[in-house]
Amino acid sequence: MRIWGIDGGGTKTDAVICDEGGRVLRRTQGGPSNCSARPMEQVLSTLTKTIRTLTAGLSGADAAPDAIFAGISGAGVGDNAARIRAHLQALFPQCPCIQAGTDAKNALRSAIPAGDGAIAIAGTGSGVFVFCGGEMQQIGGWGYLLGDEGSGFDLGRRALKSALRARDGRGPQTALTAACEQRLGKPVTQAIAQLYQGGSAAIAGFAQVLLQEAAAGDALAVAEARAAAAELAGGIQAAGRMLDTSPKAVATVGGLWQNPFYRSLIQQALGAAYRLIAPTLPPVYGSFVIAAGMAGATVSPETEAAFRASLPM
């Protein structure tokens, strides 16, 4: 069998062709394919170009997928998943098993290949997805205006607000003021227009400022970091209440999880009932796992080992 996995996000589209044993036969990467950030026509065009590169030089059965799963950022919104699936079906009308869905599904399966579990995303934004009884439910992740608690944006906003409050005399003095201003190269009160123009990504850039000062012991930075960690932990605990497992397995995805201090704060807020699992394979492995299941193939530890050993970097 030829089993295809596709993972598409804001920076790239990753695609693999594998056999049923998990051996990676082909891998290629294309441009970004986040349907929430780009018109659907661009996303579909990127998928087509990526697939053409993936299959270049192949013919016959080698170029004919038996199953495809495409996990694409933003595919869980509206009819995006249906449109992506229809596009793939038009490209491969003979393929019996094609599905598309949010990239949270394959990100989860890259860390927890089977069974119920949850995934906690903490990057510029945040959100928790829980997979239980064959269904996936979203908790949080409603964007920086209405949610994204515990995200890079949330942490960065807390750092900048603390610096502004200290400058105004409305809040305690804090090392965050000097740290933010060092990053800005000017007083924070003179950078307001710059920060608004930069949008959520610019604000999220100050997350590491908050975490660095918290790790160094600044009292206000510690308090703000703990508050943000508690918010994200609350979303994870809401997911945990749907899981009948012990400990409750939670896959962690996003750059903030790479910060040991912040990760430890979240683990402290959760307690021993939760096990945070950092994926050691890219999300496209989860796409393969889902597609393999669609095709009736068994995914075992040996399958994972074969994928890991044959994955081109």
Predicted regions and their residues:
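Short glycine-rich anion-binding loops that position phosphate/pyrophosphate groups of nucleotides
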Residues: T11, S73-A75, T124-G127
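Short beta-strand-loop/turn "lid" adjacent to the catalytic site in phosphate-handling enzymes
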Residues: R52-F92, C97-Q99, R109-I112
